[in-house]
Amino acid sequence: MTVTVLVPGETGRAALAGQEWADLVVYDPDHDWPEPASSAEVLVVPPAAHTADRLLAAMPELPKLRLVQTLSAGVELWEGKLPDGVLLSNARGAHGGSTAELAATGLLAVYRQVPQFLANQAGHKWDQHPTETLDGKRVLVLGAGDLAQSLRSQLEPFGATVTLVGRSARAGVRSFDEVPELLGGHDAVVLMVPYNDQTHHLADAGFLARMPDQAVLVNVARGPVVDTDALVAELTAGRLRAVLDVTDPEPLPADHPLWDAPGVLIFPHVGGNTTGMTDRAWRVAAEQIGAFAAGQDPPNLVS
């Protein structure tokens, strides 16, 4: 079966060119739909947050729309907001390895004091002293999907012990109900959960208080999963450390106290932003749309 697919820009046309199931129509997310859009059954949406509201408002103009396909794993901009009867599929699997890699990089940088040594280098200061190591560290990962599995495979060769947490307990995965009792027994906590009403401020003051002194909080999920004010208080007190690829607010204002808090390493939301990112996202999107065109549910169906 051939389906009409709206793709954002010529990059989308090039990525899906040659797919026999696709009749491609290019659109500009910042402008009105092109004339052939009325027959579109699939809409591929860009990851840029600033276009989401406009596209959602214009979706009723697509009477045949049946599937919205994202190019990111996060779907908080779209979930629960689509017209009735429209499916939502994401790009889970496209960015898991690179996002996990950044989380591992952050932990290594904190334990080996890379920011301090860089500051010493800038000041031409030779300060030889011992550091911590990832070997033997107990890492609690809130998440059990492809990101979490990838992180575990990256950390365990360093000698770390990794515990995954999912919505329900199963082989090799603990339940979210156990998180309060698990926090105190781990040296690092990595947030890899989707952002929704249930995970908003998941890492609040009470959550952070249960973490041991000098534990490291790593957030590669979404900024609002962490209560920023509560985290700044813990960092300022010198009790916890943090690695953040995402912040709340984001982008982080230049005068925000988080920038100058001790013990924090901040990345500007670049976990998945690596060489080949776009190609990987479109490859996953093609798999999802191809399944839909064949009359099947997309493997990454969200809702």
Residue locations for each model-derived region?
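C-terminal helix-to-coil terminal segments
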Residues: 89-102, 116-117, 250-303
